[in-house]
């Protein structure tokens, strides 16, 4: 690409912010309402952590580019960590897809109020998963083409609320909503971090291609941090203004928080329009992400990390069996979480459970990438910024883990250890195969 066509820092920052912002924010205000305006500190900590992680990945992309991103970086520390990261990453993605599905269902509750209840919401989400599984099996590449349109549509009410919503902001309402978590301020902040981080999951892929940027070694890391920070500021403004516009009980009970703010700002006609836009955005995003999960399974199978069935593709390159297996797992988890919440709660409770699990599963891959940058660049003054961002990224992973419930944390830890057991089995099979080949060659 000629130098004249390459983009500079300002444009690059805009691209990163656009890549970062999406449907992840759409249902967060309902979950954060149960914590309160104090979640602003959770946002600030999350932004610092996300910017640090963004720098780590941008630095690794420019200094040590590897096919496979976090999986490759973890593998540079230890092949066992690479295997573990590949499995964790795959499962985090399909679990995250369920959260996107629940967001779509929640915004559809504007038209079908029964979808605010966990059981109907769970059933609807499972139905959506299977519909898009079959769409992708038939070759639904057209779905991904609609994703960009959907993301623009979902961001309109978010940005509008962040900018215009302050006209309806009430300081007394905000003060009453400061800490609604029935716990100490410190615990409320830590609890909010796990939720806030959901909006930044995907930070590892936000960096733009170095080939389209002027002076990429300087511009890409800086733009990635600035773009992540810009997205975070929009998130803070949008969620904090809602804390001053409505009582926490209204937001917590809402299945479509930005539809409510749009109706206040523009009139009642806007709520169904925003709900339809957001549901459309989430559905197109889900369709696109489901195919990406299927392709991730193919890569893992080709690397020898997953059973061969995941790597089987048809004449069109579609991993039908992998898509079906992912849909079965998504259905099983959705049934389990729906049953756990069936005694009471809302669709947003399902969202909170799913995002918590998905975020926790990404913490080890993020941590390994930070450690790999320290390994690659060393501990010295010359690479001071890289060292600080790597350490901050590691600390942020620890803080996010602290915000998890004991059940979520224990589950993540157990799954991580079970993966290493499978790795040991894989190594045994590889060694046995190698010894058999060696014996056969000696016999000849």
From Swiss-Prot:
Its main location: membrane. One of its GO terms (cellular component) is plasma membrane. Induction: Part of the cadB-cadA operon, which is under the control of the Pcad promoter. Expression is regulated by CadC. Highly expressed at acidic pH in the presence of lysine. The global regulator Lrp also has a positive effect on the expression of the cadBA operon when cells are exposed to moderate acidic stress in the presence of lysine. Repressed by H-NS under non-inducing conditions. Repressed at pH 5.6 by OmpR. GO terms for biological process: cadaverine transport; cellular stress response to acidic pH; L-lysine transmembrane transport. One of its GO terms (molecular function) is symporter activity. Changing residue 89 to L: Strong decrease in both cadaverine excretion and cadaverine uptake. 10-fold increase in Km for cadaverine for cadaverine uptake and 5-fold increase in Km for cadaverine for cadaverine excretion. Disruption phenotype: Mutant shows reduced amount of cadaverine in the medium. Residues 1-6, 56-94, 144-148, 214-221, 294-322, 375-383, 426-444 are cytoplasmic. Belongs to the amino acid-polyamine-organocation (APC) superfamily. Basic amino acid/polyamine antiporter (APA) (TC 2.A.3.2) family. This is Cadaverine/lysine antiporter. It comes from Escherichia coli (strain K12).
């Amino acid at each position: 690409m000629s130098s004249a066509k390459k983009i500079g820092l300002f444009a690059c920052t805009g691209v990163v912010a656009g890549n970062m912002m999406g449907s992840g924010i759409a249902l967060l205000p309902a979950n954060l309402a149960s914590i309160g305006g104090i979640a602003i500190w959770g946002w600030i900590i999350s932004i610092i952590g996300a910017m640090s992680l963004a720098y780590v990945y941008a630095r690794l992309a420019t200094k040590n580019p590897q096919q496979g991103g976090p999986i490759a970086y973890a593998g540079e520390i230890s092949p066992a960590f690479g295997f573990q990261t590949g499995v964790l990453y795959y499962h985090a993605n399909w679990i995250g897809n369920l959260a996107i599905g629940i967001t779509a269902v929640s915004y559809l509750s504007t038209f079908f109020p029964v979808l605010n209840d966990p059981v109907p919401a769970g059933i609807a989400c499972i139905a959506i998963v299977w519909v898009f599984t079959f769409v992708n099996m038939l070759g639904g590449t057209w779905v991904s083409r609609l994703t960009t349109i959907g993301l623009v549509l979902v961001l309109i009410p978010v940005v509008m609320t962040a900018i215009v919503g302050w006209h309806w902001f009430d300081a007394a309402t905000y003060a009453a909503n400061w800490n609604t978590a029935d716990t100490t301020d410190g615990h409320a902040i830590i609890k909010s971090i796990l939720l806030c981080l959901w909006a930044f999951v995907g930070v590892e892929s936000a960096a733009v291609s170095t080939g389209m940027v002027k002076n990429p070694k300087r511009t890409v890391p800086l733009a990635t941090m600035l773009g992540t920070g810009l997205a975070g500021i929009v998130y803070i403004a949008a969620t904090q203004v809602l804390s001053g516009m409505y009582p926490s009980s209204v937001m917590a009970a809402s299945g479509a928080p930005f539809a409510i703010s749009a109706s206040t700002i523009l009139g009642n006609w806007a709520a169904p329009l925003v709900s339809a836009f957001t549901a459309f955005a989430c559905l197109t995003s889900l369709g696109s992400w489901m195919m990406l999960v299927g392709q991730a399974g193919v890569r893992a199978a080709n690397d020898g990390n997953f059973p061969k069935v995941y790597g089987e593709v048809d004449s069109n390159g579609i991993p039908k069996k992998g898509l079906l297996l992912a849909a079965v797992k998504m259905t099983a988890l959705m049934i389990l979480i729906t049953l756990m919440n069936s005694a009471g709660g809302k669709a947003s409770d399902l969202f909170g459970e799913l995002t918590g699990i998905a975020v926790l599963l990404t913490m080890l891959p993020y941590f390994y990438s930070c450690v790999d940058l320290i390994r690659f660049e060393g501990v010295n003054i010359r690479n001071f910024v890289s060292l600080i961002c790597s350490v901050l990224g590691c600390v942020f992973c620890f803080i996010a883990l602290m915000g998890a419930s004991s059940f979520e944390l224990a589950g993540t830890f157990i799954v991580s250890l079970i993966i290493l057991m499978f790795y040991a089995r894989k190594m045994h099979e590889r060694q046995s195969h190698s010894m058999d080949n060696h014996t056969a060659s000696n016999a000849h």
